[in-house]
């Protein structure tokens, strides 16, 4: 017929509890290689065979989910690309996603400015913490990284505009943004000292803004492909190094 019956489970699906449709990558034939025989569907999430279970993060928020498919139905009309050609579609989606994540360099620059303001407001012995040489050194290092990420993003975006589609360079953008964001919010907690451990109404600075973003930043190094995957991609496809021995 014109429909596919799908069973399986997917963990860490972002915002599935809001979605009417989700990209689904499913195996539809054996294939000669592990990435062959895969098809990409645009799955209807509002059908009886789809169950979405929440995953509550350590910051108390609910962004991620487990999705269970029990005889879920997908139709030929919901296939993206061709049957058994889903790997190519998936790679294209990931490249677009990583380029989109890389665009967070602009918010990273704003967050750095907020971090500097925090360092000006936090005092130690009535002296702003930003006056300490080691703090200024760490802030300078973060500034260099954020500016480097921004310039690299502009370079990769320029190439993308020329060729008409995102490339593997998106892994660089994604890696830089994820790791720099985590480092920035870790520095914010460090600057606050023991007050950085306070939560919500007890937080002295920003009503837990820094604490919540610090906790969430760890997930940013996982979602959209872990930092380790990005490093392997950069090493193999940009630097031309040998493949990961574990593959």
What label would you give each PLM region?
Residues 6-8, 24, 41, 69, ...:
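Buried hydrophobic positions in well-ordered alpha/beta secondary-structure cores of metabolic enzymes
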Residues 12, 21-23, 40, 64-68, ...:
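Tryptophan-centric aromatic hotspots in well-structured domains and transmembrane helices
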